[in-house]
A protein has these predicted regions:
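Glycine-centered flexibility motif
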Residues: 13, 66-68, 108
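Vicinal oxygen chelate
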Residues: 2-3, 33-35, 43-48, 59, ...
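Solvent-exposed, flexible loop/coil residues
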Residues: 15, 73, 107
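Contiguous beta-strand/loop segments that form the cofactor/metal-binding neighborhood of enzyme cores
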Residues: 54-56
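Core segments of cupin and vicinal oxygen chelate
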Residues: 8-52
Length: 136
């Protein structure tokens, strides 16, 4: 049985800023947002761009953090990966620069301003790393 996984990101008062950031970086649209009466706290937000979805909200107490969380996004074209990489690196920190990885295919890691690490990947079927290097 296939399952879809939707990342749920929890913030300590930064969810409003994260919504705007992810809308711009990933060309996402707001499917649903529930906020407090003052408009300061996000109780629930659901963003989508047709390829993947994000849910996010603010927690009143400091959110629990995992020891390590990476969100791997697999792209259908190198151009699409490069566009998202450029938008992420505008305000984010490059952890692994975009390059052909030893394991084949294009790969990068960027930590966004909210501390979320995005791993970006693209691979052409049947192509080895050496063949991908010819595209540079």
């Amino acid at each position: 049985m296939p399952y879809a996984a939707t990342p749920c990101l929890v913030f300590a008062g930064q969810a409003k800023q994260a919504i705007v950031y992810y809308e711009n970086v990933f060309a996402m649209t707001r499917r649903r947002i529930i906020m407090d009466e003052a408009g300061d706290t996000v109780y629930h937000a659901h963003l989508s761009n047709g390829a993947f979805e994000l849910m996010l909200w603010d927690e009143s107490a400091a959110p629990n953090t995992s020891s390590s969380l990476h969100l791997l996004l697999t792209f259908t074209s190198l151009e699409e990966l490069e566009q998202v990489y450029l938008r992420l690196t505008t305000d984010g920190q490059i952890v692994t620069p975009l390059a052909v990885a030893d394991f084949g295919g294009w790969y990068a890691q960027v930590r966004d301003p909210f501390g979320i690490l995005f791993a970006l990947s693209f691979s052409e079927e049947g192509r080895e790393s050496e063949a991908l290097l010819e595209r540079e």
